[in-house]
């Protein structure tokens, strides 16, 4: 009986992984690639870059390819072929250059990353990303902002008769310079990967010197129909609010809007998503973050 239960659990996890792969690759195809009247005529697979470096952290890059929209059948079992595993990925701070090592890591999705322990991000520094795959060369540049956000948090019940809780970020910004922020959230302890929080791309041009910002749960494409942006009792929640540069802000704003504006991603808005990557789509972004961890308790 135990063996049967273990087998069912394994099959369930495999099915969830396959579905998540399908959803993510379809999103990258539908929202990152411009729509065209001849949807089958001009469809080509493109490289997608999801890379970041934060103050005090190591660079991490995930590289995939879009699933091209064609008239031919594409088996879900072949989606692993769209993870790029043999690229040469280099990060430079303008003085030193480091080649990142590709490896499998189940703490991320897709579970293959390029990283290194030989370079840490520093606030105020600029970092150059170069990706070489066959004859293709992809480049991007980002800067880690000098200042981390000045932020406090509070956790409150949504209402007196509700079992859901809301996390609020109390953000102060008295700098005269333009500042941009991105909120990420993570529920659970079995992953290292954060999701961009729902409506979590912020500019101080609209915030003023002080603002209270709801920290909504990140919305993944594999979420069920009963998704809620709030948190349940006993949820283990990690929140990251990061100062980012303007390019990163535009990318995350476009990306999260495309997800949040569509309950069915097959009918999502066809707007192109901003990218700071030359030769591919996606984003290479520097962050100066503040992280906070919560376990949601019953305050009734």
Regions found by a protein language model. Name each.
Residues 2-5:
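Acidic, Ala/Val/Gly-enriched low-complexity intrinsically disordered segments
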Residues 8-23:
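Bacterial N-terminal signal peptides that target proteins for export
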Residues 25-26, 54:
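N-terminal hydrophobic alpha-helix used for membrane targeting or insertion
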Residues 35-300:
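A sequence/structural signal for flexible, mid-protein segments enriched
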């Amino acid at each position: 009986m135990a063996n049967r239960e273990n087998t069912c659990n394994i099959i369930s996890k495999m099915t969830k992984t396959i579905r998540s792969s399908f959803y993510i690759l379809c999103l990258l195809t539908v929202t990152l690639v411009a729509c065209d009247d001849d949807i089958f005529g001009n469809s080509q697979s493109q490289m997608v870059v999801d890379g970041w470096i934060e103050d005090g952290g190591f660079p991490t890059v995930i590289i995939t390819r879009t699933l091209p929209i064609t008239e031919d059948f594409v088996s879900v079992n072949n989606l692993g072929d769209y993870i790029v595993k043999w690229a040469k990925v280099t990060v430079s701070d303008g003085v030193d250059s480091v080649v990142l090592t590709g490896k499998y890591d189940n703490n991320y999705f897709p579970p293959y990353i390029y990283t290194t322990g030989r370079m840490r991000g520093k606030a105020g520094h600029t970092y150059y990303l170069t990706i070489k795959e066959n004859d293709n060369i992809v480049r991007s540049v980002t800067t880690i902002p000098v200042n981390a956000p000045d932020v406090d948090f509070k956790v409150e019940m949504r209402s007196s008769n509700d079992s859901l809780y809301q996390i609020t970020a109390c953000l102060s910004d008295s700098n005269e310079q333009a500042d941009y922020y991105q909120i990420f959230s993570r529920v659970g302890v079995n992953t290292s990967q954060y999701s961009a929080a729902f409506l979590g791309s912020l500019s101080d041009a609209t915030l003023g010197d002080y603002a209270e910002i709801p920290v909504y749960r990140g919305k993944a494409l594999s979420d069920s129909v009963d998704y809620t942006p709030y948190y349940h009792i006993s949820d283990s929640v990690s929140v990251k609010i990061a100062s980012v540069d303007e390019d990163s802000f535009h990318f995350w704003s476009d990306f999260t809007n495309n997800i949040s504006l569509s309950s069915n991603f097959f009918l999502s808005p066809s707007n192109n998503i901003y990218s700071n990557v030359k030769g591919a789509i996606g984003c290479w972004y520097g962050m100066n973050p503040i992280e906070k961890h919560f376990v949601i308790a019953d305050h009734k």
